[in-house]
Regions:
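Preferential activation on post-signal-peptide N-terminal prodomains/segments
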Residues: 1-173
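A short, surface-exposed interaction/processing loop segment used at functional sites
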Residues: 68-95, 178-183, 187-212, 283-302
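Segments that shape or occlude catalytic/ligand-binding pockets
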Residues: 108-269, 274-277
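Glycine-centered tight beta-turn/hairpin loop motif at sheet-sheet or coil-to-beta transitions
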Residues: 52-54, 280-283
Length: 302
């Protein structure tokens, strides 16, 4: 189920990330509450200091609530890298994540969230916002994505979050983002960490659930994939853009979170098969329940 971060979550982030021990990691979040003027239903705490090199190190904690008081997503972030408006995914021209950066990220993740495992890594570059536009900077880095695992199996990571189709003004059915831990190690050894939308596994609904055979999953996918992308395929074919047509190059069995049918405030961690696009390693073209073969829309979260 979705939960809120506590001081016990913030403390290991601070201990792992600050290069100089931070003296004021909160024991009581309420005592450090600072209203966020941009959102009446949220609060924020912040800790910052300069390290030995004079670089500012900053830890932020945000928690958002619906107007009825129900917790929404929260996030803990740390940054001692050069400040950028955002980081964007790189492409094949910027290479693979470095081994040193991966070791740094794995070490931080082990200290911050031991129940998480590495799900994906790529190269990234910083973006700076000017008065007129957002432009890429010369600074690049390695990005690593960690997701919660269960019994040694991580939940797969895709670029589509369950808030993709959300109506931001509809607080009653507001979706909770998938839990994820991002760690970016830039090429100057700066670190950016973001852990968002914490969840807690509260129990097991079904032990030793029987999964459909892979042959049955392939039969279902063979029926559904052509139907789902028929119009897009015809569009690309008509314009001789065969290079962009849908091709599956990876099929993965993992866990994902789906909303409970009986209680929308609760979620289930279920085994699924994902069929990934050859043109984008983070795009799942189809997600199928490994239990009953139903299709799961990652944009809706069920």
């Amino acid at each position: 189920e979705p939960t809120v971060f506590t001081a016990e979550d913030i403390r290991p982030v601070a201990q792992a990330c600050f290069t100089v021990p931070y003296p004021a990691v909160p024991d009581n979040l309420a005592a450090y509450q600072v209203p966020d003027e941009a959102y009446t239903s949220s609060y924020r705490i912040r800790g910052q200091q300069k390290n030995a090199a004079g670089v500012n190190e900053q830890l932020d904690y945000f928690q958002y609530y619906q107007v009825n008081g129900t917790p929404r997503e929260g996030s803990i972030s740390f940054d001692n890298a050069a400040r950028h408006y955002q980081w964007k995914r790189g492409d094949e021209t910027v290479g693979e994540p470095s081994a040193a950066a991966m070791q740094t990220a794995l070490s931080l993740a082990e200290q911050i969230a031991p129940a998480f495992e590495l799900a994906y890594g790529d190269r990234t570059y910083g973006m700076n916002r000017t008065d007129l536009e957002t432009l890429p900077s010369a600074q690049t880095g390695s990005r690593f994505v960690f997701t919660r695992s269960y019994q040694g199996v991580p939940s797969v990571y895709t670029s589509k979050d369950c808030t993709s189709y959300d109506n931001l003004n509809d607080t009653y059915v507001r979706k909770i983002p998938y839990e994820v831990l991002y760690i970016i190690v830039d090429d100057l050894s700066g670190v950016l960490v973001e852990w968002r939308s914490p969840h807690t596994i509260t129990g097991v609904e079904t032990e030793n659930v029987r999964l459909l055979s892979f042959a049955e999953i392939m039969r279902i996918a063979g029926q559904l994939l052509p139907l789902k992308y028929a119009s897009q395929e015809k569009y690309l074919e008509a314009r001789n853009q065969d290079a962009y047509r849908m091709t599956v190059n990876r099929i993965a069995l993992s866990y994902t979170r789906v909303q409970s049918r009986n209680d929308p405030s609760q979620y289930l961690f279920v085994p699924v098969w994902d069929f990934f696009d050859a043109n984008d390693p983070l795009t799942s073209l189809l997600t199928i329940s490994a239990i009953d073969g139903t299709v799961i829309d990652r944009g809706y979260g069920y």
